[in-house]
């Protein structure tokens, strides 16, 4: 996918990996970058606008845990304004296994609902122009960090959902791939709670391992966007971008 002159919606593109990715996207010259986030960040938005004045950067408040109908209403506002959207990036995520319901609501249900909502506008069966979904999942969707099983399970679910959406492309026309960062130096990793406090030092222990910066992750994210491979499972770890070959253990046969 060519980022230049495209219209992109980025959910949670104002912090951590998201903000650095927004910076890299803006440098590539999209026509519009629409940021949907729960918390406004005027300084970051001003920075993005200044980084490339030719790009129209807009912000809408959005909590991914709202009902599906509210998400559809917001997307209608955006589509009415832009007419077309080329790429949806779902990046909302929390890491706190003390908040079980919210972890699942943000990391999985919110991603599912936002993707489902945009199909109203993209699905070729409804005469839609189709589009691309990039879902930020996690390497914990491959193998869990067992001290944070709720977070890991939510990311595994998001990965499975994304893979299914990709396989439905021949029906809907909508393609999808997953972005799976490894341990990255973000606010999420600085301090978080393990499930039932089984490991109070889990954040500290993770950061003792080799990590990557948010900028390294963002630069590889943009490479994945440009590659635009339907069904790709991208691992963004240690400053590298690698496509994962998923081992098939079972097949429904349908």
From Swiss-Prot:
Belongs to the short-chain dehydrogenases/reductases (SDR) family. The active site is at residue 151. It is an enzyme of class 1 (oxidoreductase). GO terms for biological process: alcohol metabolic process. Homodimer. This is Alcohol dehydrogenase. GO terms for cellular component: cytoplasm. It comes from Drosophila hawaiiensis. NAD(+) binds at residues 10-33. The gene is Adh. CDD domains: ADH_SDR_c_like. The keyword Coiled coil does not apply. GO terms for molecular function: alcohol dehydrogenase (NAD+) activity. Keywords: NAD, Oxidoreductase. The lineage of its organism: Eukaryota, Metazoa, Ecdysozoa, Arthropoda, Hexapoda.
